[in-house]
Protein backbone atom coordinates (compact mmCIF):
# COMPACT_ATOMS: atom_id res chain seq x y z
CA UNK A 1 0.00 0.00 0.00
CA UNK A 2 1.34 3.41 -1.00
CA UNK A 3 2.03 5.59 2.01
CA UNK A 4 0.40 9.00 2.21
CA UNK A 5 2.43 12.20 2.49
CA UNK A 6 2.68 13.78 5.94
CA UNK A 7 4.20 16.96 7.33
CA UNK A 8 5.37 17.21 10.94
CA UNK A 9 5.24 20.46 12.89
CA UNK A 10 6.91 20.58 16.32
CA UNK A 11 6.10 23.54 18.54
CA UNK A 12 8.84 24.76 20.89
CA UNK A 13 7.08 27.46 22.96
CA UNK A 14 10.14 28.92 24.71
CA UNK A 15 11.59 32.41 24.18
CA UNK A 16 14.22 34.51 25.95
CA UNK A 17 11.44 37.12 26.08
CA UNK A 18 8.32 37.84 24.07
CA UNK A 19 8.63 40.43 21.29
CA UNK A 20 6.34 43.46 21.29
CA UNK A 21 4.46 42.40 18.13
CA UNK A 22 4.15 38.66 18.88
CA UNK A 23 0.86 36.88 19.57
CA UNK A 24 2.24 33.36 19.07
CA UNK A 25 2.00 30.87 21.91
CA UNK A 26 5.37 31.28 23.64
CA UNK A 27 6.99 32.48 26.87
CA UNK A 28 10.25 32.21 28.77
CA UNK A 29 10.86 29.09 30.86
CA UNK A 30 13.40 27.44 33.15
CA UNK A 31 15.95 24.86 31.99
CA UNK A 32 14.07 22.25 34.03
CA UNK A 33 10.76 23.10 32.36
CA UNK A 34 12.36 22.97 28.91
CA UNK A 35 13.87 19.53 29.67
CA UNK A 36 10.52 18.24 30.95
CA UNK A 37 8.76 19.63 27.86
CA UNK A 38 11.21 17.89 25.50
CA UNK A 39 10.70 14.59 27.36
CA UNK A 40 6.93 15.02 26.99
CA UNK A 41 7.32 15.73 23.26
CA UNK A 42 9.39 12.57 22.84
CA UNK A 43 6.63 10.58 24.56
CA UNK A 44 4.03 12.18 22.30
CA UNK A 45 6.06 11.36 19.18
CA UNK A 46 6.38 7.73 20.28
CA UNK A 47 2.61 7.53 20.82
CA UNK A 48 2.07 7.85 17.05
CA UNK A 49 3.79 4.53 16.27
CA UNK A 50 0.57 2.95 14.96
CA UNK A 51 -0.51 5.98 12.92
CA UNK A 52 2.97 6.43 11.44
CA UNK A 53 2.79 3.21 9.42
CA UNK A 54 0.35 4.81 6.97
CA UNK A 55 2.55 7.81 6.18
CA UNK A 56 5.89 8.96 4.83
CA UNK A 57 7.09 12.27 6.27
CA UNK A 58 8.03 14.77 3.54
CA UNK A 59 8.81 17.83 5.68
CA UNK A 60 9.59 18.57 9.34
CA UNK A 61 9.36 22.08 10.79
CA UNK A 62 10.44 23.12 14.28
CA UNK A 63 8.76 26.44 15.07
CA UNK A 64 8.09 28.51 18.14
CA UNK A 65 8.91 30.28 20.20
CA UNK A 66 12.63 29.88 19.62
CA UNK A 67 13.59 26.26 18.77
CA UNK A 68 17.28 27.26 18.75
CA UNK A 69 17.07 27.53 22.56
CA UNK A 70 17.08 23.70 22.62
CA UNK A 71 20.39 22.17 23.71
CA UNK A 72 22.33 19.90 21.29
CA UNK A 73 21.26 16.92 23.45
CA UNK A 74 17.59 17.92 23.27
CA UNK A 75 17.78 18.31 19.49
CA UNK A 76 19.24 14.79 19.27
CA UNK A 77 16.54 13.43 21.62
CA UNK A 78 13.70 14.85 19.52
CA UNK A 79 15.06 13.68 16.17
CA UNK A 80 15.95 10.21 17.46
CA UNK A 81 12.31 9.83 18.49
CA UNK A 82 11.11 11.03 15.07
CA UNK A 83 13.38 8.68 13.10
CA UNK A 84 12.49 5.69 15.31
CA UNK A 85 8.76 6.36 14.98
CA UNK A 86 8.20 7.70 11.47
CA UNK A 87 9.30 6.79 7.97
CA UNK A 88 11.05 10.00 6.84
CA UNK A 89 11.76 10.54 3.13
CA UNK A 90 15.51 10.66 2.50
CA UNK A 91 15.04 14.00 0.70
CA UNK A 92 12.76 15.49 3.37
CA UNK A 93 12.99 19.24 3.97
CA UNK A 94 13.80 19.73 7.67
CA UNK A 95 13.54 23.33 8.90
CA UNK A 96 14.43 24.82 12.25
CA UNK A 97 13.55 28.38 13.27
CA UNK A 98 16.20 30.29 15.16
CA UNK A 99 17.02 33.70 16.56
CA UNK A 100 20.38 35.47 16.30
CA UNK A 101 22.58 35.01 19.35
CA UNK A 102 20.98 31.71 20.43
CA UNK A 103 23.37 29.30 18.67
CA UNK A 104 27.06 28.46 18.62
CA UNK A 105 28.93 26.25 16.16
CA UNK A 106 28.41 23.16 18.35
CA UNK A 107 24.63 23.61 18.29
CA UNK A 108 24.63 24.18 14.53
CA UNK A 109 26.63 20.97 14.04
CA UNK A 110 24.08 19.16 16.25
CA UNK A 111 21.26 20.48 14.05
CA UNK A 112 23.05 19.29 10.92
CA UNK A 113 23.82 15.88 12.44
CA UNK A 114 20.10 15.53 13.29
CA UNK A 115 19.19 16.09 9.62
CA UNK A 116 18.22 19.77 9.70
CA UNK A 117 18.85 21.11 6.18
CA UNK A 118 17.03 24.45 6.25
CA UNK A 119 17.25 27.33 8.74
CA UNK A 120 14.79 30.18 9.21
CA UNK A 121 16.37 33.13 10.99
CA UNK A 122 14.27 35.84 12.62
CA UNK A 123 15.98 39.14 11.80
CA UNK A 124 12.99 41.47 11.12
CA UNK A 125 15.13 44.61 10.58
CA UNK A 126 18.75 45.63 10.02
CA UNK A 127 18.23 48.86 12.00
CA UNK A 128 19.21 48.58 15.67
CA UNK A 129 16.71 51.23 16.79
CA UNK A 130 13.91 49.29 15.10
CA UNK A 131 15.10 46.01 16.65
CA UNK A 132 15.07 47.62 20.09
CA UNK A 133 11.57 48.98 19.52
CA UNK A 134 10.40 45.50 18.43
CA UNK A 135 11.70 44.04 21.69
CA UNK A 136 14.18 41.79 19.86
CA UNK A 137 17.05 40.28 21.91
CA UNK A 138 19.77 41.00 19.34
CA UNK A 139 21.45 43.73 17.29
CA UNK A 140 22.11 43.57 13.55
CA UNK A 141 25.80 43.01 14.30
CA UNK A 142 24.89 39.95 16.41
CA UNK A 143 22.76 38.67 13.55
CA UNK A 144 25.79 38.97 11.23
CA UNK A 145 27.91 36.95 13.67
CA UNK A 146 25.23 34.23 13.70
CA UNK A 147 25.06 34.34 9.88
CA UNK A 148 28.82 33.70 9.68
CA UNK A 149 28.44 30.66 11.95
CA UNK A 150 25.61 29.35 9.75
CA UNK A 151 27.85 29.67 6.68
CA UNK A 152 30.72 28.04 8.56
CA UNK A 153 28.45 25.10 9.47
CA UNK A 154 27.65 24.63 5.77
CA UNK A 155 23.91 25.35 5.62
CA UNK A 156 22.85 26.15 2.04
CA UNK A 157 19.10 26.70 2.44
CA UNK A 158 18.47 29.77 4.61
CA UNK A 159 15.43 31.95 5.13
CA UNK A 160 15.50 35.43 6.69
CA UNK A 161 12.32 36.92 8.21
CA UNK A 162 11.75 40.65 7.63
CA UNK A 163 9.01 43.05 8.71
CA UNK A 164 7.74 46.30 7.21
CA UNK A 165 5.26 49.01 8.26
CA UNK A 166 6.87 49.10 11.71
CA UNK A 167 6.45 52.01 14.14
CA UNK A 168 9.04 54.65 13.28
CA UNK A 169 10.14 52.83 10.11
CA UNK A 170 10.70 54.89 6.97
CA UNK A 171 10.90 53.83 3.33
CA UNK A 172 14.61 54.73 3.47
CA UNK A 173 15.33 52.62 6.57
CA UNK A 174 13.42 49.67 5.07
CA UNK A 175 15.32 49.93 1.78
CA UNK A 176 18.58 49.95 3.74
CA UNK A 177 17.45 46.76 5.52
CA UNK A 178 16.66 45.12 2.16
CA UNK A 179 20.07 46.12 0.76
CA UNK A 180 21.95 44.74 3.77
CA UNK A 181 20.01 41.47 3.73
CA UNK A 182 20.28 40.91 -0.03
CA UNK A 183 24.06 41.44 0.20
CA UNK A 184 24.13 38.20 2.26
CA UNK A 185 22.49 36.25 -0.60
CA UNK A 186 19.94 34.19 1.37
CA UNK A 187 18.01 31.55 -0.57
CA UNK A 188 14.62 32.64 0.81
CA UNK A 189 13.03 35.72 2.37
CA UNK A 190 9.72 35.94 4.24
CA UNK A 191 8.61 39.58 4.24
CA UNK A 192 5.63 40.42 6.43
CA UNK A 193 3.77 43.67 6.94
CA UNK A 194 3.09 44.37 10.62
CA UNK A 195 -0.35 43.37 11.87
CA UNK A 196 -1.38 44.75 15.26
CA UNK A 197 -2.69 41.71 17.13
CA UNK A 198 -4.77 41.95 20.30
CA UNK A 199 -2.87 40.96 23.42
CA UNK A 200 0.48 42.29 22.18
CA UNK A 201 2.50 45.22 23.53
CA UNK A 202 2.09 47.02 20.20
CA UNK A 203 -1.70 46.68 20.35
CA UNK A 204 -1.66 48.17 23.85
CA UNK A 205 0.49 51.08 22.59
CA UNK A 206 -1.88 51.56 19.65
CA UNK A 207 -4.93 51.65 21.96
CA UNK A 208 -3.18 54.30 24.07
CA UNK A 209 -2.36 56.43 21.00
CA UNK A 210 1.40 55.93 21.31
CA UNK A 211 1.73 54.86 17.65
CA UNK A 212 -0.06 57.93 16.27
CA UNK A 213 2.74 60.42 16.85
CA UNK A 214 6.40 60.91 17.69
CA UNK A 215 9.33 58.60 17.06
CA UNK A 216 7.18 55.44 16.90
CA UNK A 217 4.48 56.75 14.57
CA UNK A 218 3.13 54.04 12.28
CA UNK A 219 3.82 54.55 8.55
CA UNK A 220 0.89 55.75 6.45
CA UNK A 221 -1.02 53.34 4.16
CA UNK A 222 0.81 54.91 1.20
CA UNK A 223 4.19 54.30 2.85
CA UNK A 224 3.21 50.72 3.72
CA UNK A 225 2.20 50.11 0.09
CA UNK A 226 5.49 51.63 -1.14
CA UNK A 227 7.45 49.28 1.16
CA UNK A 228 5.55 46.31 -0.28
CA UNK A 229 6.30 47.37 -3.86
CA UNK A 230 9.95 47.94 -2.94
CA UNK A 231 10.14 44.39 -1.56
CA UNK A 232 8.85 42.86 -4.81
CA UNK A 233 11.17 45.01 -6.96
CA UNK A 234 14.39 44.59 -4.98
CA UNK A 235 13.94 40.86 -4.42
CA UNK A 236 13.12 40.27 -8.10
CA UNK A 237 16.31 42.13 -9.05
CA UNK A 238 18.19 39.72 -6.74
CA UNK A 239 16.73 36.68 -8.52
CA UNK A 240 14.10 35.88 -5.89
CA UNK A 241 10.60 35.26 -7.20
CA UNK A 242 7.45 35.82 -5.21
CA UNK A 243 5.63 32.49 -4.89
CA UNK A 244 3.19 33.37 -2.09
CA UNK A 245 1.78 36.57 -0.59
CA UNK A 246 4.69 37.02 1.85
CA UNK A 247 7.35 34.61 0.55
CA UNK A 248 10.17 34.95 -1.98
CA UNK A 249 12.74 32.37 -3.06
CA UNK A 250 15.52 31.60 -5.46
CA UNK A 251 14.42 28.89 -7.95
CA UNK A 252 14.03 25.53 -6.21
CA UNK A 253 14.33 27.02 -2.71
CA UNK A 254 10.63 27.54 -1.98
CA UNK A 255 9.60 26.32 1.48
CA UNK A 256 8.14 22.88 0.81
CA UNK A 257 6.59 22.68 4.28
CA UNK A 258 4.53 25.83 3.72
CA UNK A 259 3.62 24.81 0.17
CA UNK A 260 2.31 21.54 1.59
CA UNK A 261 0.19 23.46 4.10
CA UNK A 262 -1.28 25.71 1.37
CA UNK A 263 -1.93 22.60 -0.76
CA UNK A 264 -3.72 20.93 2.19
CA UNK A 265 -1.23 18.10 2.71
CA UNK A 266 -2.00 16.22 5.94
CA UNK A 267 0.04 17.48 8.88
CA UNK A 268 0.65 16.33 12.43
CA UNK A 269 1.36 18.88 15.15
CA UNK A 270 3.47 17.84 18.14
CA UNK A 271 3.74 19.85 21.35
CA UNK A 272 1.57 22.28 23.31
CA UNK A 273 -0.58 24.61 21.21
CA UNK A 274 -0.03 22.74 17.94
CA UNK A 275 -2.73 21.72 15.43
CA UNK A 276 -3.12 18.72 13.13
CA UNK A 277 -5.09 17.79 10.02
CA UNK A 278 -5.34 14.03 9.64
CA UNK A 279 -7.86 12.13 7.48
CA UNK A 280 -10.16 15.14 7.16
CA UNK A 281 -10.19 15.80 10.91
CA UNK A 282 -8.62 18.81 12.59
CA UNK A 283 -7.55 18.67 16.22
CA UNK A 284 -5.83 21.15 18.51
CA UNK A 285 -3.56 20.54 21.48
CA UNK A 286 -3.83 22.06 24.92
CA UNK A 287 -1.87 25.34 25.03
CA UNK A 288 -0.71 25.36 28.65
CA UNK A 289 2.84 23.95 28.78
CA UNK A 290 2.65 22.62 32.32
CA UNK A 291 -0.73 20.98 31.71
CA UNK A 292 0.66 19.45 28.49
CA UNK A 293 3.63 17.94 30.37
CA UNK A 294 1.40 16.58 33.16
CA UNK A 295 -1.18 15.07 30.81
CA UNK A 296 1.50 13.35 28.71
CA UNK A 297 3.10 11.93 31.88
CA UNK A 298 -0.26 10.64 33.09
CA UNK A 299 -1.30 9.20 29.73
CA UNK A 300 -4.25 11.62 29.46
CA UNK A 301 -5.57 13.25 26.28
CA UNK A 302 -3.91 16.52 25.26
CA UNK A 303 -6.63 17.39 22.73
CA UNK A 304 -8.90 20.37 23.40
CA UNK A 305 -10.78 20.55 20.11
CA UNK A 306 -11.70 18.07 17.38
CA UNK A 307 -13.56 18.85 14.18
CA UNK A 308 -14.39 16.61 11.24
CA UNK A 309 -14.20 19.04 8.33
CA UNK A 310 -17.37 19.30 6.25
CA UNK A 311 -17.11 19.35 2.47
CA UNK A 312 -17.91 23.08 2.61
CA UNK A 313 -15.05 23.71 5.04
CA UNK A 314 -12.67 21.76 2.81
CA UNK A 315 -13.76 23.79 -0.22
CA UNK A 316 -13.19 27.01 1.70
CA UNK A 317 -9.68 25.90 2.68
CA UNK A 318 -8.90 24.77 -0.86
CA UNK A 319 -9.66 28.29 -2.09
CA UNK A 320 -8.37 30.58 0.65
CA UNK A 321 -5.16 28.63 1.26
CA UNK A 322 -4.46 27.83 -2.39
CA UNK A 323 -5.03 31.40 -3.54
CA UNK A 324 -2.23 32.57 -1.23
CA UNK A 325 0.17 31.08 -3.79
CA UNK A 326 1.07 33.23 -6.79
CA UNK A 327 0.19 30.30 -9.08
CA UNK A 328 -3.28 30.15 -7.51
CA UNK A 329 -5.57 27.12 -7.65
CA UNK A 330 -6.47 24.62 -10.36
CA UNK A 331 -10.06 24.15 -11.59
CA UNK A 332 -9.25 20.52 -12.44
CA UNK A 333 -7.90 19.86 -8.93
CA UNK A 334 -11.10 21.32 -7.43
CA UNK A 335 -13.21 19.05 -9.65
CA UNK A 336 -11.10 16.00 -8.75
CA UNK A 337 -11.23 16.71 -5.00
CA UNK A 338 -14.89 17.57 -4.66
CA UNK A 339 -16.64 16.18 -7.75
CA UNK A 340 -17.99 19.65 -8.51
CA UNK A 341 -17.13 22.43 -10.92
CA UNK A 342 -15.66 25.39 -9.03
CA UNK A 343 -17.98 27.72 -10.98
CA UNK A 344 -21.04 25.87 -9.64
CA UNK A 345 -19.88 26.61 -6.09
CA UNK A 346 -18.14 29.97 -6.41
CA UNK A 347 -19.25 31.29 -9.83
CA UNK A 348 -20.80 34.58 -8.63
CA UNK A 349 -17.85 35.36 -6.33
CA UNK A 350 -15.30 34.55 -9.05
CA UNK A 351 -17.09 36.79 -11.58
CA UNK A 352 -17.36 39.65 -9.06
CA UNK A 353 -13.68 39.46 -8.07
CA UNK A 354 -12.57 39.25 -11.71
CA UNK A 355 -14.68 42.30 -12.54
CA UNK A 356 -13.01 44.14 -9.64
CA UNK A 357 -9.61 43.08 -11.08
CA UNK A 358 -8.74 41.20 -7.89
CA UNK A 359 -8.70 37.76 -9.56
CA UNK A 360 -7.55 36.61 -12.99
CA UNK A 361 -8.13 33.40 -14.93
CA UNK A 362 -5.48 31.76 -17.08
CA UNK A 363 -6.30 28.40 -18.64
CA UNK A 364 -6.97 26.00 -15.77
CA UNK A 365 -5.82 28.40 -13.05
CA UNK A 366 -7.51 30.98 -10.85
CA UNK A 367 -5.15 33.40 -9.12
CA UNK A 368 -4.94 36.73 -7.35
CA UNK A 369 -3.92 39.74 -9.41
CA UNK A 370 -1.16 42.03 -8.15
CA UNK A 371 -3.90 44.25 -6.74
CA UNK A 372 -5.63 41.22 -5.24
CA UNK A 373 -2.41 40.30 -3.42
CA UNK A 374 -2.37 43.76 -1.82
CA UNK A 375 -5.83 43.25 -0.30
CA UNK A 376 -5.62 39.48 0.01
CA UNK A 377 -7.30 39.25 3.43
CA UNK A 378 -10.46 40.86 2.06
CA UNK A 379 -10.40 38.77 -1.13
CA UNK A 380 -9.83 35.43 0.61
CA UNK A 381 -12.64 36.11 3.10
CA UNK A 382 -15.06 36.08 0.13
CA UNK A 383 -14.60 32.30 -0.17
CA UNK A 384 -16.15 31.49 3.21
CA UNK A 385 -19.41 29.70 2.39
Region spans (language model):
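Basic amphipathic alpha-helical segments that dock to polyanions
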Residues: 334, 350-356
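Local cysteine-cluster metal-coordination motifs and their immediate loop/turn environment
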Residues: 13-24
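Minor-groove-contacting beta-hairpin "wing" of winged helix-turn-helix DNA-binding domains
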Residues: 365-369
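Flexible, acidic/Gly-rich N-terminal and inter-domain linker regions that tether
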Residues: 1-6, 16
